[in-house]
């Protein structure tokens, strides 16, 4: 799916950081840190992270995404790499690892997620920072963005938002993730892609098992929306503690 030219084009056209990302990056990433950017996609996070890092490496399991990044930033280091196997990197190599835009949720089973967390912990230096995001299993409604529309377009955007929210909620309830606070669904937004969903309460033991402590949790619509049922995903800033 992520080698599809249309998908690659969509990711290449995504620009800038979300306010929640900007907040966590500014707070936890220091000038001249060595940064590994996992699931780099079309390079949305590359301008910010590469500018602040002493060494920046972007990786993605889609070769087409990696090629798109090479075209955009030929001077930077981009590699085709699976997040569950970072064996090309030595232990304690990076100060910071970033896995943005819920990329970790594309790993299709719990054992794969555990390998990913373990590999990230391995390549981080002692006290290193891991910033990632994960879909909210208890999302009730995806609030539409209405700042750029007028008239009937407002109605259609609200209607579309309700339609997609209902689709996701039905799948979350059907699969048990809403009640359990974690689980897998087949996402209607991205063509039936299998995605993991979680809550801050269910993420905490998962990252703890890999040797991380959560320092801060921020909702994806921060600072304007803080209600849990209206938060599509959460960002987590974690520190390697063992």
Features from the language model and the residues they span:
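Conserved class I S-adenosyl-L-methionine
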Residues: 1-39, 48
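A short glycine-rich, Lys/Arg-flanked "PGG" loop and its adjoining helix->strand segment in the class I
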Residues: 114-126
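Class I SAM-dependent methyltransferase SAM/SAH-binding core
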Residues: 42-85
């Amino acid at each position: 799916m992520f080698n599809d030219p249309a998908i690659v084009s969509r990711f290449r056209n995504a620009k800038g950081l979300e306010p929640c990302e900007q907040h966590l990056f500014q707070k936890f990433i220091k000038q001249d840190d060595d940064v590994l950017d996992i699931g780099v996609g079309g390079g949305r996070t590359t301008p910010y992270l590469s500018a602040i890092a002493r060494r920046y490496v972007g990786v993605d399991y889609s070769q087409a995404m990696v090629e798109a990044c090479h075209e955009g930033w030929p001077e930077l280091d981009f590699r085709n790499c699976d997040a569950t196997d970072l064996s090309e990197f030595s232990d304690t190599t990076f100060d910071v690892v970033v896995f943005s835009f819920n990329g970790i949720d594309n790993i299709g089973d719990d054992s794969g997620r555990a390998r990913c967390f373990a590999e990230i912990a391995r390549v981080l230096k002692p006290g290193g920072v891991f910033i990632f995001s994960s879909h909210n299993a208890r999302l009730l409604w995806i609030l539409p963005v209405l700042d750029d529309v007028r008239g009937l377009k407002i109605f259609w955007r609200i209607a579309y938002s309700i339609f997609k929210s209902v689709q996701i909620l039905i799948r979350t309830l059907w699969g048990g993730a809403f009640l359990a606070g974690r689980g897998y669904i087949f996402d209607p937004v991205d063509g039936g892609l299998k995605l993991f969903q979680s809550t801050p309460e269910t993420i905490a033991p998962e990252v703890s098992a890999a040797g991380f402590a959560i320092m801060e949790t921020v909702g994806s619509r921060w600072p304007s929306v803080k209600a849990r049922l209206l938060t599509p995903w959460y960002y987590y800033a974690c520190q390697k503690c063992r």
